[in-house]
A protein has these predicted regions:
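Active-site-proximal cap/lid insertion segments
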Residues: 1-181
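Catalytic-site signature of metal-activated, phosphate-bearing donor transferases
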Residues: 183-185
């Protein structure tokens, strides 16, 4: 019982504990379904933090009355979901640190698309389902203190299809020679 994102992270940390205790390498993929509809089930305390926020400055279209109220409510719920993910990522990092494995653990943080509502996408056009940058450009953060200096930025184009070959390359796994995949490191 509990909020889904919390449950996913709890299970991942239990799996990591078992792997570390058994002195085994581990791979954990935590795919939160947040922020995503349905938006009714969000942590109440986090929702309360955002429920009175006016989100109209980040909307790409002016809304009024009921439409603005409904969009503000939805965005408050999305903000609560994002905050919950942030808190869980923080818990995960603290957990890895406490286990003594953070330094040599690769953590990749990414999402799959832009917003599917009238939310701000910077100076980019489009949103989810659009092939414009506002619909397809998304962050990919790579954390590996033992090998990657913090603060580095890259403008290299990549996609989810590139994650597996990049991880295999980073871990010096030669499997791509015998089992080629699409994507590149």
């Amino acid at each position: 019982k509990g909020y889904c994102t919390d449950i996913y992270f709890d299970a991942a940390m239990q799996f990591i504990d078992k792997s570390v205790n058994a002195k085994k390498n581990f791979f954990t993929y935590i795919a939160t379904n947040a922020p995503h509809g349905p938006f009714h089930d969000v942590p109440a305390k986090l929702y309360e933090k955002y429920q009175d926020v006016d989100f109209s400055p980040i909307l790409i279209k002016e809304l009024k009355n009921d439409r603005l109220e409904k969009e503000n409510d939805k965005l408050a719920r999305i903000a609560a979901m994002i905050t919950n993910i942030d808190l869980n990522v923080g818990r995960l990092f603290e957990h890895l640190q406490a286990l003594g494995v953070l330094e040599n653990t690769i953590v990749i943080y990414l999402n799959d698309n832009g917003p599917n509502s009238l939310r701000f996408v910077g100076d980019m056009r489009g949103m989810k389902t659009h092939v414009d940058d506002g619909g397809i450009r998304s962050p990919l953060l790579f954390h590996w203190p033992a090998k990657v200096k913090s603060g580095q930025r890259s403008s290299e184009m990549c996609a989810h299809i590139d994650v597996l070959p990049t991880l295999l390359d980073a871990c010096s796994v030669d499997g791509l020679k015998t089992h080629p995949v699409d994507g590149r490191s």
